[in-house]
């Protein structure tokens, strides 16, 4: 699969930033993030950096923007479908567990955003769950900007570190 992406980007250099944005968004959003691996995003970023298709700061900024918009979209998706989801028979049977989880998220919501950004398995799920919880959008937004900034720094280190090993 990555060979196809690599070939596409080699033939369409001007679309490299769109590919980075798209993969960053998809790996962060609840509906696609469960399927799209962050390894694809990292591989695309490393390829674009090694082929010098974009400067490093552009790669990182576009990836951060895509990730942030994916997180915010997941948060508001949770706000939108959360009440309906919580009213389902399946969820209502687990009311005690749901209340405990909501209490935990209400206490630790902002920290959960930052932690979730660095754990690929839960990355797309955390914003959605926080959208269902009572966390205010402004608190989520600020925490997510901090999380995506820290993640962008880590992405810079990953891209340059792996890039120097390969190239």
Regions found by a protein language model. Name each.
Residues 1-22, 51-128, 132-144, 157-167:
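Membrane-interfacial helix-loop-helix
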Residues 38, 144-146:
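Central hydrophobic cores of alpha-helical transmembrane segments
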Residues 33-47, 125-133:
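Re-entrant/interfacial helical elements at transmembrane boundaries that shape
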Residues 31, 50-51:
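Short helix-loop boundary/capping segments at the starts of domains
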């Amino acid at each position: 699969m990555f060979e196809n992406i690599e070939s596409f980007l080699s033939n369409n250099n001007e679309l490299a930033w769109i590919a980075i944005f798209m993969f960053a968004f998809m790996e962060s959003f609840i509906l696609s993030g469960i399927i799209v691996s962050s390894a694809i995003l990292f591989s695309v970023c490393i390829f674009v950096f090694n082929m010098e298709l974009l400067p490093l700061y552009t790669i990182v900024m576009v990836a951060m923007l895509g990730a942030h918009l994916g997180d915010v979209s997941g948060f508001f998706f949770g706000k939108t479908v959360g009440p309906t989801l919580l009213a389902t028979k399946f969820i209502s049977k687990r009311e005690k567990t749901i209340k405990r989880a909501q209490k935990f998220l209400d206490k630790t919501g902002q920290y959960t955003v930052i932690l979730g950004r660095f754990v690929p398995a839960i990355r797309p799920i955390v914003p959605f769950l926080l959208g269902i919880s009572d966390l205010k959008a402004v608190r989520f937004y600020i925490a997510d900007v901090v999380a995506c900034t820290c993640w962008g720094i880590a992405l810079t280190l990953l891209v340059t570190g792996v890039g120097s090993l390969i190239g």
